[in-house]
Amino acid sequence: MATVGMNDVKNGMKILVNNEPAVITETEYVKPGKGQAFTRMKYRFIKSGRVVEMTMKATDDVEVADVVDTDMRYLYTDGEYWHFMDPESFEQVQADKAGMGGAEKWLKGEEDCIVTLWNGAPIWVQPPNFVELKITETDPGVRGDTSGGGGKPATLETGAVVRVPLFVNQDEVIKVDTRSGEYSARVK
């Protein structure tokens, strides 16, 4: 594997920490008046999402992770694995529940996703920013029940539950922001 010196470390770079891929989110090069220069950095583990801060000497090296972000199309799930296809090479990969990272609740089929591959296996799936899903179950909105502009829970066709405004009814298609898990708009 390739290594990089602390002078070449940048935000967004993918590195290996204890044989697990991580993304550098913050770096700060510090050169004190007395003593050796060092780099303070924060990184987020791709699989678990855990954020860690580390201080390294200027002479240290970090190992670059062999991680690739690939545009892929979600095909189907067989209950245990979620199957994705590269639209250019038609190569297929399958992700398990841990590799999905919670994205499975936004996917119904034929969505374009960004799949992070490490050693050829998917370790993280990023769904599209917005998806259109049908509401399968929600309580009817009661007229006049709007003091405070509240909302109500709605179950979507993929099993995800989001809060929707009172005027949205069952069997309607809504647009959901997958980054926050919030209702965005009704689809006509």
UniProtKB/Swiss-Prot annotation:
Q: Which Pfam families does the record match to this protein? A: EFP, EFP_N, Elong-fact-P_C
**GO biological process: what's one of them?**
peptide biosynthetic process
Top-level taxonomic group: Bacteria
Q: In which pathway does it act?
A: Protein biosynthesis; polypeptide chain elongation
Q: Which CDD domains match?
A: S1_EF-P_repeat_1, S1_EF-P_repeat_2
Residues that bear N6-(3,6-diaminohexanoyl)-5-hydroxylysine: K34
Similarity section: Belongs to the elongation factor P family.
Q: What is this protein called?
A: Elongation factor P
Q: Which organism is it from?
A: Xanthomonas campestris pv. campestris (strain ATCC 33913 / DSM 3586 / NCPPB 528 / LMG 568 / P 25)
